Design a protein with these regions (language model features):
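Structured loops at beta-to-helix junctions and adjacent beta-edge loops in soluble globular domains
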Residues: 45, 70-72, 94, 172, ...
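Glycine/tryptophan-enriched, flexible segments
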Residues: 77, 84-270, 402-413
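Soluble or luminal CAZymes and related metallo-dependent hydrolases
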Residues: 2, 51, 161-164, 302, ...
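Active-site-proximal binding-pocket segments
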Residues: 186, 190-404, 409-410
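A conditional alpha-helix N-cap/helix-loop micro-motif detector
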Residues: 22-25, 162, 188, 303
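Trp/Phe/Arg-rich N-terminal binding region typifying the photolyase-homology
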Residues: 1-113, 312, 334-336, 340-341, ...
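A short alpha-helix capping/helix-coil boundary motif
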Residues: 35-36, 110-111, 173-175, 288-291
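A generic structural signal for short
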Residues: 43-44, 183, 298-299
């Protein structure tokens, strides 16, 4: 869907857009190497997670021409700091001191008019199979023929692409932004933007989200507070709901991207803070109240109706309510034999079903469950000093009636 939107966007320009997907006749690796070997220069996104860092590093090493990676991930550039940060507060304080130059350094809205010449692939450089691929109408592609996991169903209530992302952003700004800091705790009235998958796939940028919000509130960079305290509130001098959203888009999102960039082992138990590993190892021998397998988790077959509902939402919709996503992950830690097993299960479920999976932000969420970016709390069985969450406290904190009706036992996985 994103490719279809791109094809439409590029059609009036001099850019020859090739939707890149694997077929039996044209393996992705062969296609990319052929293009690189015919290129004058290669420009690609920099993305610090999943298999992409290794793939792009290898391509850069073997490329016969200049190979550039562009960091357009977040408002605060990954290269602007030579270290990662262990807490959101420490990173927030750092960016409050140093982000000013980047608040006016946004991408050009439409750079395409600068391209003066069009390009048409021909048989001199490409095989007939590739030429057929290049001229393929992506709108007629039969997705069932692609080598992907077809047990994961398509999401019916949302589509990909920039147009859809922009509609969601405008709708959110008109209906959800002004209560973002309050209703985030309501499962029945989720005010979240729903844009995380679109950010992940590059269908919209954090820059556009932030810039549109600034325009809406007639804000400019000169309005920030003069003192960097690391506080989540009152630094932007915007209404509380807007500051809460900016903290998610800039502080938490960029924190995760920078962490993955500086720590290639970001998805492993070994990458966790020492205090977290020590306390969990101290409690490895604790009796778990329940033990579930990956299959039981995947099929929402636990004793907990709230956990099961969250898992059903993930499988059916590719997303999960933000607060329940934290509880969901905490309970996997609670109901497995080791933290390593919990990480493996969380990574599998998140990467398989979440539309925003395989992303630094989602890895931040998984590993926060086990202590990353957090501090030590009161010691408990199994968790040790890892932050503890329960379904009972969630019931008291959140409105769940409609949510449980929507994703209850009759909602099959």
């Amino acid at each position: 869907e994103g490719m279809i939107a791109n094809q439409t966007a590029f059609s009036p320009s001099n850019v020859h857009y090739i939707p890149c997907f694997e077929t039996p006749d044209v393996p992705i690796k062969e296609l990319l190497w052929t293009l690189i070997n015919q290129a004058a220069a290669v420009v690609t996104d920099y993305f610090p997670a999943f298999f992409l860092p290794k793939m792009t590093a290898l391509a850069a090493q073997k490329s016969p021409v200049q190979f550039q990676q562009i960091d357009g991930n977040g408002i605060y550039p990954i290269w602007a700091t030579d270290r990662h940060y262990t807490t959101a507060h420490s990173f927030r304080r750092h960016i409050q001191k140093t982000i000013a130059p980047f608040l006016n350094d946004f991408p050009v809205d439409d750079p395409l008019p600068r391209l003066q010449r069009s390009y048409t692939p021909n048989s001199t450089h490409f095989s007939n199979a590739m030429l057929t691929h290049f001229t393929h109408d992506i709108t007629t592609l039969d997705v069932s023929t692609l080598p992907i996991d077809h047990s994961v169903q398509a999401i019916s209530d949302r589509k990909g692409g920039y147009g859809e992302a922009r509609k969601r952003l405008v709708h959110f700004m008109n209906t959800g932004l002004n209560k973002y800091d309050v209703d985030r705790q309501s499962a029945d009235n989720d005010p979240s933007s729903g844009l995380s998958p679109y950010l992940h796939f590059g269908h919209i940028s954090a820059h556009e989200m932030v810039q549109r919000i600034w325009v809406l509130y007639q804000w400019n960079p000169s309005m920030v507070a003069t003192k960097a305290t690391g506080s989540r509130e009152k630094w932007w001098n915007l209404p509380a709901p807007v500051e809460a959203l900016l903290d998610q888009i800039i502080t938490w999102r960029d924190l995760g991207f920078i962490y993955c960039h500086h720590n290639p082992n970001y998805a492993t138990y070994e990458s966790l803070p020492e205090w977290a590993k020590i306390t969990m190892e101290d409690h490895l021998g604790d009796s778990r109240p329940y033990i579930y397998t990956l299959k039981e988790f995947e099929q929402a077959q636990t004793h907990d109706p709230i956990w099961n509902a969250a898992q059903r939402q993930l499988v059916k919709e590719g997303r999960m309510h933000n607060y329940l996503r934290m509880l969901w992950a905490k309970k996997v830690l609670h109901w497995t034999n080791t933290p390593q097993e919990a990480i493996a299960i969380l990574e599998e479920l998140n990467n398989k079903y979440a539309l925003d999976g395989r992303d630094p932000n989602s890895y931040s969420g998984i590993m926060w469950t086990l202590g990353r970016f957090d501090r030590a709390w009161t010691e408990r069985t199994v968790f040790g000093k890892i932050r503890y969450m329960t379904s009972d406290s969630t019931k008291r904190k959140m409105k769940l009636k409609n949510y449980l009706n929507t994703y209850g036992p009759t909602s099959t996985v």
